[in-house]
Amino acid sequence: MTELLKISLPDGSVREMEAGATPADVAAAIGPGLAKAALAAKVDGEVRDLNRPFEGDAELALITSRDEEEALELARHDYAHVLAEAVQALWPGTQITFGPATDDGFYYDVKAPDSRDPFGMDDLPAIEEKMREIIKADKPLVREVWSREQLIEKWEAEGEVFKAEWAKELPEDEELTVYWSGEPGGEDSWLDMCRGPHLASTGKLDPQAFKLMRVAGAYWRGDQRNPQLTRIYGTGWLNKKQLNAHLHRLEEAAKRDHRKLGREMDLFHLQEEAHGSVFWHPQGYKIWRELEAYMRRKMDGAGYREIKTPQVMDARQWEQSGHWGKYRENMFVIPDEIPNTEDEGELVSKDADWMALKPMNCPAHVLVFKQGITSYRDLPIRLGEMGCCHRNEPHGALHGLMRVRQFTQDDAHIFCTEDQVVEEVRAFCKLADEVYRDFGFDYDVKLALRPEQRFGSEEDWDKAEQELRDAVAEAGMANDDYGWEELPGEGAFYAPKLEWHLTDAIGRTWQVGTIQGDRVLPERLDATYVGEDGGKHRPVMLHRAIFGSYERFIGILIEHFAGRLPVWLAPTQAVVATIVSDADGYAKEAVAKLEAAGIRVDGDLRNEKINFKVREHSLAKVPHLLVVGKREAEEGTVAVRTLGEKEQQVMSLDDAIAMLKDAATPPDLRDG
């Protein structure tokens, strides 16, 4: 008699099943409702297809739409496959590559047949219609294990150049899986190479819960030397209600787009002559300077000493630090040139002598620390820099202020003893909390743990990770109120890190602040201090930032506040606008008094209707408009219009100045 499999369920019960049984069989045995609702299964912690047989006794948790995170991941993966199937059905000869799920949808990279132009936006409606047809057909999604040779033969026979190339590089001993859409080998079946898992059939998707959004160029394997493909992006959800909510969020995000508002408010611009670098206009640079002054006050108060380090350093320094091997492709590298003695005036490169624009500030800060002899009594030493860095990001990855090539960090490094690490991290947690609260952000705290590729011993990593856990616990943040979570494999190559994820006004999250404890870089760059025993010891180096980069943080602020920045940050805090020319003299007097009080103010004395002026300054997001006419001039008053409010307040000029001074006071300088 065949021994039955013991399948343990989350409620503690155990189901006995015949050999060859699947999670779908367990769901059906429990009840028809669950059998219908089940989308996939978690078998011994691994997400699998519902119809994949158990391999022995197992722990089983069935995934339904209530398990939203896992359900969305599965659905989006399936939408990507349906997209590729639809494109090949509509345009035979299309070559497919790969298409993953993303944070809010999916994409697939494809190459159009030579007989037509690359796919464009005009093709999306037809693709969507074909996708709905495939979904409504409720085609089974069937997993099979193939050999490497089978895969290569299949893709070469069908002219799938990209898939064949990929298959040839797969390890011979790896279990290789394909998925059929439709009965395997059937007339209307479609095949793709994929690890899975997938839903049981295309009909498990909602045909009204996805939308194709855009197309973009992409290179095979992300290499510009390879053929160009078309990346088709879509968004996918579990139901139409979720899709509509997402599209509404996108509409709201478009209104808040920092690139659009940056133009309207005349803050900055970008252009092709300086890919990934920002041209700050006077209005935008006022925001920058306010943030910089704010951060300097916070860092001065927390015991940091500001330094300034070189933009360019010898490649040997980056080799020694380990960055050359890890970041070389993302560094701007230039030859260290000397005069050519044979042809005076021309420049040639010395062999193997290269310089690089710094992609980060850390090695330079170690070099500052190493100047002179440091005693344990001097520690901790906190070195801060508004450090300008450069990273050679691909053109396609650049995005306004959010992803740039030249950026400035509120960077700092703390050199301390082993015994000081937890207290320094705890103090940083407190400082970060103060800053984010000053800007009105809620946030989550995450711990990014060791990646597969890393420097340092396991003992060092164990210690560094535990120190961060202890510090967060002491700061009172290791709980659900702060969204505490550990992220395996997400740490830097030299250290684990704490991450701060801000939530903006429309619910999006932005990872900004970090702190990481590093024992690798001090070792590689031979940083030491003299201990109490008179011997040399390695300091622990804590890398930390709060804004992350000024460019990105300003972009986040613009979108979070939809351009309506807090008064203390607004480039122009008030405009005095006249109704009639008779009030010009009084308006100039008001502007002078406001400037004397430290308010950033302009006067608008143009011969234009007041409604025109109101609209113009509202578009520029000026927080307060002080309207003056003949009566106000005679009475020494102003009519104050606050951005976003319908009613205006009439008050004396002195009261208006007092109100604006209070509103314009940075949060860290307020009493109480």
From Swiss-Prot:
Its main location: cytoplasm. Zn(2+) binds at residues 362, 413, 543. Residues 1-64 form the TGS domain. Its cofactor is Zn(2+). Keywords: Aminoacyl-tRNA synthetase, ATP-binding, Cytoplasm, Ligase, Metal-binding, Nucleotide-binding, Protein biosynthesis, RNA-binding, tRNA-binding, Zinc. It catalyses: tRNA(Thr) + L-threonine + ATP = L-threonyl-tRNA(Thr) + AMP + diphosphate + H(+). PROSITE patterns: AA_TRNA_LIGASE_II, TGS. GO terms for molecular function: ATP binding; metal ion binding; threonine-tRNA ligase activity; tRNA binding. It is found in: Cytoplasm. Its EC number is 6.1.1.3. GO terms for cellular component: cytosol. Binds 1 zinc ion per subunit. It is an enzyme of class 6 (ligase). SMART domains: tRNA_SAD. PANTHER family: THREONINE--TRNA LIGASE, CHLOROPLASTIC_MITOCHONDRIAL 2, THREONINE-TRNA LIGASE. Catalyzes the attachment of threonine to tRNA(Thr) in a two-step reaction: L-threonine is first activated by ATP to form Thr-AMP and then transferred to the acceptor end of tRNA(Thr). Also edits incorrectly charged L-seryl-tRNA(Thr). Homodimer. This is Threonine--tRNA ligase.
